[in-house]
Amino acid sequence: MSKQILILPGDGIGPEIMAEAVKVLQRIDTQHGLGFELVYDELGGAAYDKYGSPLADETLERARAADAVLLGAVGGPQWDTIDPSLRPERGLLKIRSQLGLFANLRPALLYPQLADASTLKPEVVAGLDLLILRELTGGIYFGQPRGNRTLDNGERQAYDTLPYSESEICRIAKAGFEMARLRGKKLCSVDKANVLASSQLWRAVVEEVAKDYPDIALSHMYVDNAAMQLVRAPKQFDVIVTDNMFGDILSDQASMLTGSIGMLPSASLDANSKGMYEPCHGSAPDIAGKGIANPLATILSVAMMLRYTFAQADAADAIERAVGKVLDQGLRTADIWSEGTTKVGTVAMGDAVVAAL
């Protein structure tokens, strides 16, 4: 079996956190005899600086050839003024769409050692373990037509389009039901079917797919209510499935229930479990180069990669246990530090996880 992984450190803190994730990957590779081949390239702003494009053609070909892609983060203020079509984020959108990565998995898991880090009361979030499944290659971020125009009265207007086809909804719905079957057998589909035509089709197709999953309890919720319920009573959810834009917003909201977005990994999968794995957080240019970024989300993304693309559950479990051990030792990066714990930097945190394996 081919086991090639494309490493894309990206921008901002990306190279720093990726270095620690690769250390962990290499240790687990040695321990379990997995035989991975690591290939390196650039994406985002770093790719624009090197190639003149946020995603070079040769990088895309390397991504197609690899079995999995591990990404740091993209973006930064130094690229804010370039042509919008060349912005770092466009490279991220393009690689997702070109690889057919339609299912984005964003877990929100509260580590008991970090219960005090959440802004919500401990009794509201203790034991939180939910998964948001976001459709990633359709909807308003890719819909056409989109653009800017000047109206007859001289006023500027901008417009976007939110299309979803039956097949796009069907495949993400099936993925949602399958994930729910592996977890708590509850699926909540989030839409805005009281207003949007695309959401009305979304709800209808999800209902049709549900007939093949009689063992899963399906519910529907409008996105505004879902945002409120995530704060009011987040433990009511097991798996949430939703469209691209709603999932983008709700998954960031859910991440803060856990106290730090620096703890949360994500996976973006195609129909055959090939995936791109990355932390939920951004490139954090304000702390780039300071050696204080939290690498745990990227390290946990490695665990997701081992679990979902390479079917190495034992190796994935080992990484997740090692992260738990490090937290038990009281080691914290600045974003999750609290009184009575030991503040460490990026490299020290990565070394601690390697030592705990």
UniProtKB/Swiss-Prot annotation:
The keyword RNA-binding does not apply. PROSITE patterns: IDH_IMDH. It catalyses: (2R,3S)-3-isopropylmalate + NAD(+) = 4-methyl-2-oxopentanoate + CO2 + NADH. Its cofactor is Mg(2+); Mn(2+). One of its GO terms (biological process) is L-leucine biosynthetic process. GO terms for cellular component: cytosol. The record marks Y141, K192 as: Important for catalysis. It is found in: Cytoplasm. It is an enzyme of class 1 (oxidoreductase). NAD(+) binds at residues 76-89, 282-294. Substrate binds at R96, R106, R134, D224. SMART domains: Iso_dh. Coiled coil: none annotated. Mg(2+) binds at D224, D248, D252. Keywords: Amino-acid biosynthesis, Branched-chain amino acid biosynthesis, Cytoplasm, Leucine biosynthesis, Magnesium, Manganese, Metal-binding, NAD, Oxidoreductase. Binds 1 Mg(2+) or Mn(2+) ion per subunit. PANTHER family: 3-ISOPROPYLMALATE DEHYDROGENASE. Belongs to the isocitrate and isopropylmalate dehydrogenases family. LeuB type 1 subfamily. This is 3-isopropylmalate dehydrogenase. It comes from Xanthomonas oryzae pv. oryzae (strain KACC10331 / KXO85). The gene is leuB.
